[in-house]
Amino acid sequence: MCGIVGCILKEDNDVAPILFDCISKLEYRGYDSIGLATFADDNIHIKKDKGKIEEVDKKLDLSDMPGNFGIAHVRWATHGDPSKLNSHPHVDEDASIAVVHNGIIENYLEIKEKLTLEGHVFKSDTDTEVIPHLIQKFMDEKFDLEHAVRKTIDVIEGAYAIAAISKNEPDKIVATRKDSPLIVGIGEEGYYLASDSPAILKYARDIIYPERGEIVILDKDGVVVHDEFDNVVNKEIDTINWTPEMAEKEGYDHFMIKEINEQATAVRNTLTQKDNIQEIIDDIDDIQRICFVACGTSYHASLTGKYLIESLAGVPTDVILASEFKYSANTLNDKTLVIFISQSGETADSLKALDVANQTSKTLGIVNVAGSSITRRAQYVIQTQAGPEIGVAATKTYVAQLTSIYLFAALLSKNVELLKEIEKVPDFIDETLEDIEFIEDFSKRYNYARDFFYLGRGYSYPTALEGALKLKEITYIHGEGYAAGELKHGPLALIDEGIPVVVIIPPGDNYRKTMSNLEEVKSRGANVLAIGSADDESLKAKADDVIAINADVKEIIAPLVYIVPLQLIAYYITVEKGHDPDKPKNLAKCVTVE
């Protein structure tokens, strides 16, 4: 949700331009305000306000601040309205300590009440403000900054990533985390910390991943990590294989359209995980049940996985929303494989569920971000190879997740024919994208709509759900996905003249029944947009608009290809409406609070 960065330079150069550059690359996490704190001339300097990054920068000139070290923050309001007063960094009473924080302090009201009785005066409505006040309290008791932070995290409850600076201990940043992401970067010019790697890729690709409760100290000479017993921890340094350019638009108008166009590459790269997946399957040959746990788009990928695994391998498979997992946890056993799917690997609900599942079952993470919490806590990992995804609405990470699931299902069931079909998917995606101008033109005709319905059967049902989600996320148009066979059980009552209905109808076993459903909505006045085979003349005669997909795309792999035009429809309607598809209102890329 919120994003934090920190930097200390080896030389006495101004750090503010770097902090501003880094924090700007975390805006995809969702934000309503931005702030920076630096240290110079024996004082902490702070600039912050609510609003878009470019607007606040124009007003405050955020790059023009003295000092060679500092911290920065983009805030996504959870406690207190979006305002200058509630934006980070927050300080103690005499502004000797500044703190940025991502997460939620669950017991902040209790702490605030106690500190108020001790004479502390609070200025904001946030939970975060108790942190600098606690640090001040412990530093007044003669603890240094590191140990004051340690004492503070012994008091606070919840999920957090925290970075703090003190004017009484210059040239030092102290950070810690619990159940919120935090990485540390080692660069040629300095040392960095951030909520996510795209923020610091330009400056550091050698990364340290602090564990829960560890204290990280950054100074001009390097990085030191202490465990909860104050012992120095020798951390392994990983190198991120993403390049800074991967996190840039590279000439596209938006990240989302860039990432849609990168999907064939994402599939090709993820196919390289085949041998790793085979090793995992060889090691879990005694499983009797599979349970997917996911949220949002990853949940739809999981539903496709259920269809594949049950139909091909005959293994009973459940799909559970991560936020609802606790109600099913007592059904797990040592013959259950629990698969956690997450783009970020930091989704709070999934991490809570993973900790529970690890106690009884085998666990597997399918994750895009290397070194994320799920990759470190799951027993097995499949690394999708989509590269950094900046747009809030998932596109290329969805097809990369699907690719991993398809490989898993094909190898688990020893289905050689499916493996051959998966290899064709990148070319099918590239071919579909060749019709991008046609899709753009007719998508604009649908921006009048207040409601959309998406219909699919079998493997195409999760695709319908995902298409509807993409529409809702970025166009702000109400969209619902349904199993086409459920039309008569309620949704048909909502069909009126001119309502757009998207029908996903690849050739295969479900074709005839889906065509009957298409005719049902058409006869009631719906404006039918069908996605089907290029050689389907009957479909072209019955639908109002048809997006033609290569006839060689078989029904079983249709989810990997047919989703592409649905993403494009949502994108182009959004652009026509004048919205920013990369930063939809009220949404964040990485949901790190429950």
Language model features with spans:
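Generic C-terminus detector
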Residues: 527-529, 552-594
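Catalytic-loop motifs flanking and including active-site residues across diverse enzymes
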Residues: 127-130, 301, 305, 400-407, ...
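Glycine-rich oxoanion-binding loops at beta->alpha junctions
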Residues: 68, 72-85, 268-282, 305-341, ...
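Active-site phosphate/pyrophosphate-binding segments
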Residues: 256, 262-267, 271-291, 363, ...
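Conserved short alpha-helical segments that host acidic/polar catalytic motifs at enzyme active sites
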Residues: 1-249, 253, 262, 268-269, ...
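Extended hydrophobic-aromatic, low-complexity segments
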Residues: 185, 301-302, 319, 348-351, ...
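Glycine-rich phosphate-binding loops that contact phosphosugars or nucleotide phosphates
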Residues: 282-428, 457, 504-549, 569, ...
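Acidic/histidine-rich
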Residues: 156-190, 447-473, 508-510, 515
